[in-house]
Design a protein with these regions (language model features):
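Substrate-binding clefts and catalytic carboxylate motifs of secreted carbohydrate-active enzymes
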Residues: 1-16, 26-33, 43-231
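A general structural motif
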Residues: 36-40
Length: 232
């Protein structure tokens, strides 16, 4: 019916299955020109052996796996892209991408009601249209001309012991203001497509690190927190 109504476009579907006997979906996959994989693109190698003509893409992926989902496409011509869940935040599946603190309601969104959460909070772009640091990292992976981006990870224990869900990323911010944390270690993340990066605090060089593909185009540098100006 799809091809009858519109013969000009390829037909696809997102295969959403967690079964160990993944191969039972081969007949369904053969009906499509493009085969979408929800969270299962790691099965690409064995699938390609069984069906070398299959053209694949990841139709849903976890936000924190940005590098590997880019690498699958970069390294294999039969994988043409990745769709993260999700690009933009939305209402529903409340708290699917939340991080939380020890002592708060635990577990994934499907385990229990996560009130007062009402947004999903798994978007690279948040509910009011602001980009999270993960969005800059993903953008840089897919576009080699993007400038470096500097962000800071919330220290574990600053507000509480951090817990993550399957669709969350560690709370990371474009901020160097952490009162009360003076002298204690804090992690800085720099996303960069150049071979190396230098980190300066109050105009003093504090670290230099490689940022090649081996490092996933990212430097994670731990330094003591000192108020002032951080730049790279």
């Amino acid at each position: 019916l799809c091809r009858e109504l519109d013969p000009t476009r390829p037909v696809t579907s997102a295969l959403c299955a967690w079964d160990s006997d993944w191969e039972i979906y081969d007949p369904l996959a053969e009906a499509f020109e493009l085969v979408g994989y929800n969270y299962m693109i790691h099965k690409h190698a064995t699938d390609h052996e069984r069906d070398p003509q299959r053209v694949m893409y990841q139709s849903e992926s976890y936000p924190r796996e940005a590098f590997w989902n880019w690498a699958y496409s970069a390294d294999h011509p039969y994988i043409f892209g990745d769709f993260v869940w999700t690009a933009i935040d939305y209402q529903g599946e409340s708290g699917i991408g939340r991080w939380y603190y020890q002592g708060e309601s635990e577990g994934e969104h499907y385990h229990r009601n996560q009130y007062p959460w009402h947004a999903a909070y798994c978007g690279d772009i948040d509910f009011v249209g602001q980009r999270k640091p993960i969005s800059y990292y993903r953008d840089m992976l897919w576009n080699v001309d993007r400038p470096l981006y500097l962000s800071v990870k919330e220290p574990n224990g600053y507000y509480g012991q951090i817990r993550e869900t399957q669709w969350s990323v560690w709370p990371t911010f474009e901020s160097w203001t952490w009162p009360g944390h003076e002298g204690r270690p804090i992690e800085v993340e720099i996303y960069n497509r150049a071979p190396r990066v230098r980190l300066y605090l109050n105009d003093s060089l504090v670290a230099e690190r490689p940022t090649t593909r081996v490092e996933e185009y990212k430097a994670v540098i731990t330094i003591p927190y000192v108020p002032g100006t951080l730049r790279a």
